[in-house]
Regions:
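RNA pseudouridine synthases
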Residues: 1-256
Length: 256
């Protein structure tokens, strides 16, 4: 077995698959799609090798995308018509985010338009001339260094059962961060990162929008839940992925 095949076996985490769709849990630090500078280490390339080993030649069509340093669920269609149907009908996408500071409300909606920042091909900004963007959030847990969260009040204002079982149970009892569940109503580039930075609560380790110097780091964002109506069967498909170990560890370390 080649090193690339070993990496696929280690990294490829398939959460759902049928004749039309593939949903994979992406780790942080890798691109979803190839670029001119990076090809073999991308998620798409690893999935292609996975199918090639089984003697299948598939052209996957992305339905959702994630930044390199964002982990979580990515949806691929195995047929272009499935891709088109899912994009047209839309999907319910939710994220778990570690945001710095304490949000002013336990539940809120951030509804600011976003546009590309002049002079940058990557960075976005709040701009009244930008495209409409809407993010709804619920605080799952919050505290500061002086206040300890008791076990029975980790999520008093939402049903913790909405989250994967191993998410809330492994959280630290004391932290300067806020764990937030986010629902996107639009899907703009860097939407969650820009929206929380705009209200003074940038994501943990987000050096693009959080004024943190240095090279890009793993930021506190995980695509944890996706739900949609299957284009063929018309049944509801819902897939979830718990907060990964590295973000749980960051949450715990922040309180020490």
């Amino acid at each position: 077995m080649s090193p690339s095949e070993r990496s696929v076996r280690f990294m490829l985490d398939i959460r759902y698959e049928d004749e039309a769709l593939l949903i994979v849990n992406k780790p942080p630090g890798i691109l979803v799609h190839p670029t001119t500078k990076e090809d073999e280490t991308t998620l798409s390339a690893q999935i292609s090798r996975y199918y090639q080993r089984q003697g299948w030649q598939l052209n996957l069509h992305p339905v959702s995308r994630l930044d390199r340093q964002t982990s979580g669920l990515v949806v691929f269609a195995k047929l272009p018509e499935i891709q088109g149907q899912l994009i047209k009908q839309g999907m319910q996408k939710e994220y778990l985010a570690l945001v710095t500071g304490v949000l002013p409300a336990r539940h809120g909606i951030i509804d600011y338009p976003i546009a590309r920042k002049p002079g940058s091909i990557i960075e976005r900004e709040i701009n009244p001339e930008g495209k409409p963007c809407k993010t709804e959030y619920w605080v799952v847990s919050r505290s500061d260094r002086l206040k300890e969260i008791q076990p029975d009040t980790v999520a008093p204002y939402m049903d913790a059962g909405d989250l994967p079982a191993d998410t809330v149970s492994s959280l630290s009892r004391q932290t300067p961060l806020s764990l937030v569940r986010c629902r996107l109503y639009t899907g703009r580039t860097h939407q969650i990162r820009v929206h929380f930075a705009s209200i003074g609560c940038p994501l943990w380790h987000d050096n693009l929008y959080g004024n943190i110097p240095g090279p890009p780091q793993r930021h506190g964002l995980h695509a944890y839940r996706i739900a949609f109506v299957h284009p063929w069967t018309h049944t509801t498909i819902e897939v979830a992925s718990a907060l990964p170990e590295d973000l749980n560890r960051a949450w715990q370390n922040a309180s020490q």
